[in-house]
Amino acid sequence: MFKAQATFSRYSAAVSLLLLFSGAAQAAPQSITTLPLQPDGENRWRLPAGEYQGQFTIEQPMQLRCEPGAVIQSQGQGSSLLISAPDVLVEGCTLYEWGSDLTAMDSAVFILPAAERAQISNNRMRGPGFGVFVDGTRDVQVIGNEIDGDAGVRSQDRGNGIHLFAVSGARVLHNHVRNARDGIYIDTSNGNHLEGNVIEDVRYGVHYMFANENSLIDNVTRRTRTGYALMQSRKLTVTGNRSEQDQNYGILMNYITYSTITGNFVSDVQRGDTGGDSMISGGEGKALFIYNSLFNTIENNHFEKSSLGIHLTAGSEDNRISGNAFVGNQQQVKYVASRTQEWSVDGRGNYWSDYLGWDRNNDGLGDIAYEPNDNVDRLLWLYPQVRLLMNSPSIEVLRWVQRAFPVIKSPGVQDSHPLMKLPTEKLLTEKQEPTS
């Protein structure tokens, strides 16, 4: 019925090495043709209801649709489905208990380099390893899947919900990922589109590494240890995303350049446990953290009710920051550098809920600049023990001296045109995804 096709990839290499050196007696995957498939047209097949045990390969183009009640149970070994042919569709299947060996990249669905244009749609997956692993191919679609990791396993020992490696042209849309390591991990993959995904109770909600010209639109993260971890990438478009009740960081930018961060909503980011993850340091509950990132546009975002609104450090300069709202954060800004940063563009600044200035000419802009940090703030950052003197007369004298003699003023953030009205009300009223 089907013709076999030989394929070699990182996956097959990893499995071969494991079997060679460990002497493992893992059963070899079987062809999908060993299942009682029912024809449904040319290259179209249906899998009837029932529980099917094992791991299965798809080696020729086909459309596989599972009827309600069709379950593939992999008994804690290997990958449930291994796809090595182009133009394969897998839809409506339930995949349980695949393997947990992250070195072998055990996955519910593993897509090999030859499997261009694969479509993985509306499936349910629950297991300890990776959910959907896409390895070195292009134009894959991962749409409408429910992926649930094993909450009983340490976060570091789980697989990612959706993992893209060396992938281009992928569309990852409207998936729901829970209890994985990272929700969606994009590694060395350019030109991909993520939209409408909901990610909860993971380490990083969305994690980019060395991934350029990707778009991240209208996604939601909740209760993660970092909502959106953007690292070592350029020309990202990050628009309309929400971070709700995440810990440590809402949006983290690490070596990000020439990217656009607009229309995002971040709320209730608080200090949290990093879970032993050495990649996360500090964890002060920052709505937006910008580290060594330059030439980015950060506009029309809403950052609220977090321990720290925005923190810039390590040479994060020459970014366009305007039209954002910083509302009710315990501390609005943390910035330590050697030169002053102007946070307004073309006469339009940002909204600051703690701004105490006035607008006498009713042009919607404050008449005096907003300057969130002064020499005393810098002193407190460098020497935290000084906080014991926070309300003492000596601190008040220092603040009075720097106001009276601005010549000793140190570099910091200045918003010369602060907004008097909240510019992000639309983000507050947009319909939210229901909480699970």
From Swiss-Prot:
PbH1 repeats lie at residues 85-113, 115-136, 137-166, 167-188, 189-210, 233-255, 293-314, 316-354. Induction: Induced in response to denitrifying conditions. Activation requires NosR and DnrD regulators. One of its GO terms (cellular component) is periplasmic space. It is found in: Periplasm. Residues 1-27 form the signal peptide. Required for the assembly of the copper chromophores of nitrous oxide reductase. Could be part of the ABC transporter complex NosDFY. This is Probable ABC transporter binding protein NosD. The lineage of its organism: Bacteria, Pseudomonadati, Pseudomonadota, Gammaproteobacteria, Pseudomonadales. The gene is nosD.
